[in-house]
Amino acid sequence: VADWETKRAWLNYAYDEFLQAGYKISSAYTVVKDNSKVNFSYRDNLWQGSDLIATGIASFGHVSGVHYQNKADMKEYQSDLTEHGKLPLGRGYKPTRHQLLVREMILLLKRGYLDVDYFQNKFEVDITQQWSSQFQQHSEDGMLTIEGGRIQLTRKGFLNADALLPVFFEEEHQGIRYT
């Protein structure tokens, strides 16, 4: 298995090749040829807090303000569905409003940018004030820029998108490995 430095080098190479072929970076994980013809409805709606019913083993879902994960063991998952006639729910959690803000912010940051006014209007929070030191550090590290109410990932930021996120987690959620 390749180390992170190698994986980032591969991704950087892939970005260059796609950009030369006329594609644009759409998120830390996607490129598109023509933004006007491509709609990542699933991603964009989910990342902005819409409900999603999880249907696979160990899948995460979000319904009516509750986050949940299906069972991770295949036998238990199948048994719940076929023998017990119930959903294979493994665990669930009702996040606070602040946790919903954090969730939405970190997911949308993977898209490559954040509009500060969006969060002010939806959550009544100025994210540049709430996490000023975190954004400042990421800016100093060359991961993002902050201009005119917009936080924008740099290429370096896209290559390290997932590594940027934990500083925004609540303390009790940092350092946790999720299935």
Q: What is the predicted function of each stretch?
A:
Residues 139-149:
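A short, conserved structural fragment
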Residues 150-154:
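Minor-groove-contacting beta-hairpin "wing" of winged helix-turn-helix DNA-binding domains
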Residues 158-179:
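Short, amphipathic alpha-helical interaction segments positioned at domain boundaries
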